[in-house]
Amino acid sequence: MANNVLNRYLFEDLSVRGELVQLDEAYQRIISSKEYPAALQKLLGELLVSTTLLTATLKFEGSITIQLQGDGPVSLAVINGDHDQKIRGVARWEGDIADDASLHDMMGKGYLVITIEPKKGERYQGVVGLEGETLADVIEGYFANSEQLKTRLWIRTGEHEGKAHAAGMMIQVIPDGTGTPEDFEHLEQLTATVKNEELFTLPANELLYRLYNQDSVRLYEPQPVAFHCGCSRERSGAAIITVERAEINDILAEEGSVSLHCDYCGTSYSFDEAEITELYAKAAPEKKTLH
């Protein structure tokens, strides 16, 4: 069984590249941080797969964020991933959401934002409306309009052996001019036959052979995908001391402690009065040095 891994592959004779991502634990970590409705869990899985597939196209160190915003019950759904395939995500919603709610049922009138942030270089952001029935439709439209590259995605979420899985495939034309529309259509037809169980369970080499055994496919080394939110007690403490001490004292007087909650993983960090005093005391010499 293939778990939490991204595979890149190339159709050497057809000028088309492909990607395959298969996730279970990384997906489960994201949807277990809050009591997300079933339809929103599915949407987060689709966003997660899409982001992972897109980060695989990065030719530099950096990150990609895919964000949905709308005026529906779900106001925000966002996944962030980087070149090392460290991913995290969160969503915000209000009210009840039906188990079979569609993208448009959840988001209402909204848009998709794709943000690319290189460690070195300029930040890029693309915004598109929610055209199409599914998230895959929206992202395919983004590539057609902004990148002008023929791209297809197949994204699946579901359960296997009682555990949540999210997986997907992407094929994209390589802009070298040697491929034909017929080549791409041929691969589209083959990829569209993939079954959920195959995506959730088969190792990449076996899955690609089942789909493309008549074509020449080069499979590259796999890359692990892992949930990573980046929160810590140290970072929480550093955030607290950016607030005026008087304001923190008011919270202490009312609550008895100061707590920070990580939306990504669901962890809370609590600091009592003695710990707060120590934080500010340690920070004081640093502030004097800065002045």
UniProtKB/Swiss-Prot annotation:
CDD domains: Hsp33
InterPro entries in the record: Heat_shock_Hsp33, Heat_shock_Hsp33_C, Heat_shock_Hsp33_N, Hsp33_helix_hairpin_bin_dom_sf
Keyword vocabulary terms for this entry: Chaperone, Cytoplasm, Disulfide bond, Redox-active center, Zinc
GO biological process: protein refolding
Post-translational modification: Under oxidizing conditions two disulfide bonds are formed involving the reactive cysteines. Under reducing conditions zinc is bound to the reactive cysteines and the protein is inactive.
Pfam assignment, any one: HSP33
GO CC entries: cytoplasm
SUPFAM superfamilies associated with the record: Hsp33 domain, HSP33 redox switch-like
Disulphide bonds in the chain: C229-C231, C262-C265
GO molecular function, one term: protein folding chaperone
Domain of life: Bacteria
Main location per the UniProt record: cytoplasm
Localization per record: Cytoplasm
NCBIfam families for this protein: PRK00114.1
Family annotation (HAMAP family): HslO
Family: Belongs to the HSP33 family.
Function: Redox regulated molecular chaperone. Protects both thermally unfolding and oxidatively damaged proteins from irreversible aggregation. Plays an important role in the bacterial defense system toward oxidative stress.
Protein name: 33 kDa chaperonin
Gene name of this polypeptide: hslO
